[in-house]
Amino acid sequence: MRINGVLNKAAWALVMTAGAASTQAAQKVCVFDILGASGDAFNMAKDYGLAMQKQGVTLELKAYTNEGVATEDFRAGQCDALLASAFRTRQFNTVSGAIDTLGSTTMIKNGKIDMAASYDVVRKVIQTYASPQAAKLMVQGNYEIGGIFPFGAAYPVINDRSITTVEALAGKKIAAFDHDKAQALMIQRVGGQPVSADISNFAAKFNNGSVDMIAAPSLAYKPLELQKGIGAKGGIARFPIMILTYQLVLNQAKFPAGFGEKSRNHWLGEFDRAMSMIKNADAGIPAAAWIDLPPENAQKYNLMLRESRLDIASKGIYDAQGLKVIKKVRCSMNAADAECTTKSEEG
């Protein structure tokens, strides 16, 4: 009886210890999605959680509709990882954050913007960062990038179709995110008026007429009801200011060694799924809402974005190492481009 009692106590202690270990093993992930737990990003995060469970890591997801709050909760240690737009995650890793920079992934072929090739630049950069050779670049301080996926091109969304040239932007009010200094600099460069905004209110400012233009991906069109701001006179210019990404940041100390690489490879495998979402969103915008720029203007404006990108990088806002990686990918795909004979973005 006594032996049985001791064994029972020992077994109970093991159960309690295992229970405590499993409780400790659950890592919290702050997930920003404008639609909360019903959105595409959160659904992708749920599948990520299931995949990582097979790797021995249990994740507990928390949905946020306010990206700023999600980021601050992560900073404060209330979450062990953060899934959000690169505008927010750039503060934790400037190298991967360089993907979301003015025109950095845009490809011009035969004088026209080639969107398929542009997304291929993003794919190749994500592949590069998922490789073991680039693992060191994905770590800055206590933080590690655990994955990247595309969220679509940021297109100019305007309330008046006469604003289809850079010259016409002079004096126009344009939303600029407070947490991305490059936006205000670019707006000032073209003579526009930057209006302070963030991801939680920029669409409302456009829809109520407080600003004349915003930059947004097609995935935002329906959820943010951008047709209200576009009205009968506005539209969406089919010109990518940049290709946006979502990025996962890990508090490295909270995850087992080697987890970051497994995590990055999972998200690399989600690239095509993300592209399907983007293509569906593009197709869901009424044909009449799109504005096609003349090819010569698109090429001219992309060169302007490049000049702005170089200027902003010289101010230390964009990461030189990250831009170097992206240029290398661009030039591997189109070595004939004039920029590939220059030393710019190679510092």
Identify the function of each model-found stretch.
Residues 1-12:
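Bacterial N-terminal signal peptides that target proteins for export
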Residues 19-26:
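Sec/Tat signal peptide C-region and signal peptidase I cleavage site
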Residues 26-47:
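Extracytoplasmic "Venus flytrap"
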Residues 49-59:
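Signal peptide-proximal N-terminal region
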Residues 50, 75, 87-173, 179, ...:
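Contiguous mixed-secondary-structure segments that line small-molecule binding/active-site clefts
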Residues 60-72, 178-181, 193-208:
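Short helix-initiation/N-cap motifs at beta->coil->alpha
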Residues 64-104, 157-161, 214, 218-230:
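Pocket-flanking alpha-helical
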Residues 222-239, 245-251:
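A beta-strand-loop signature enriched in Asp, Gly, Thr, and Trp
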